[in-house]
Amino acid sequence: MPLPDFHVSEPFTLGIELEMQVVNPPGYDLSQDSSMLIDAVKNKITAGEVKHDITESMLELATDVCRDINQAAGQFSAMQKVVLQAVTDHHLEICGGGTHPFQKWQRQEVCDNERYQRTLENFGYLIQQATVFGQHVHVGCASGDDAIYLLHGLSRFVPHFIALSAASPYMQGTDTRFASSRPNIFSAFPDNGPMPWVSNWQQFEALFRCLSYTTMIDSIKDLHWDIRPSPHFGTVEVRVMDTPLTLSHAVNMAGLIQATAHWLLTERPFKHQEKDYLLYKFNRFQACRYGLEGVITDPHTGDRRPLTEDTLRLLEKIAPSAHKIGASSAIEALHRQVVSGLNEAQLMRDFVADGGSLIGLVKKHCEIWAGD
């Protein structure tokens, strides 16, 4: 399928996707019932969409195009009420978190969807292992060239986004020692990590043509980069965050990305170059492994900075943009989080350290989601 022309969007408009866990009490393992839930809610959703993701244990909640985080929060709140009623009616529960702490990938059923079945044929067991749960945020752009500039700008802050959203310390019944283990699942995919370097939309079109020669790429949706342009929506999509445990934190993360995008495209503070990515995977690893306690390294100067310190600096820089787009509440909430030194991964570990089981942890996450 050829790459579509870049659809012109209103700059800084917002779209948010949350991949949720469908679980089966009282054991709280992943259920394989998302299709049943989608059938139950599809005629009751008035704004946004509830749909499939890769496997039957995943349920995606997606907003429509929103002007600001308040509109997105309203859509999510309405969807949440409908979904919570459906899971109650079907004796299921739902929660956030980037990974389920003890599910077995071998049990996961890929959705009966042509695209996902084709992906299963291409990637085999890797697709079942990709039963992990992320938050994706789309930001509108006026042109393809703006999208490429924004993508490179946002890529500088991938460690910050990962650390602030880290919520996947447990996997396959084990403490991984990572704050966010979810991104590691994609390390075997040939398109893992950052997008290959291009400097404008014309070069991106050439890159996509080259990738399509592999016969593994039919559309932009087949690319699993950390951040990717979405020409059919006219957006840049940030894909590195774990699904938060609460809607409020998900909305705050979206506000952070929207405000950062506004600052980047309004101020144009960087002259991007390929060398910017020299230490990308090392800095990304620091955020995944240590969360806010990680240390990032400047590829140009060699300077090393605590991620906590650099995140506070980012929040300060984007505060005026956040005020202009109605996202100040998100930046203030994230500032409090950074100062406290806590993320959701640490809260999960604290629960287990206090004697809680992994089954109890999932149960707690369901209660948190339902009570937010």
Swiss-Prot record:
Keywords: ATP-binding, Ligase, Nucleotide-binding
Protein name (Swiss-Prot/TrEMBL): Putative glutamate--cysteine ligase 2
Pfam family, one: GCS2
Annotated InterPro entries: GCL_type2/YbdK_subfam, GCS2, Gln_synth/guanido_kin_cat_dom, YbdK
Quaternary structure, from the entry: Homodimer.
Organism of derivation: Escherichia coli O9:H4 (strain HS)
EC number: 6.3.2.2
SUPFAM superfamilies attached to this UniProt entry: Glutamine synthetase/guanido kinase (SSF55931)
Intrachain disulfide bonds: none
Protein family: Belongs to the glutamate--cysteine ligase type 2 family. YbdK subfamily.
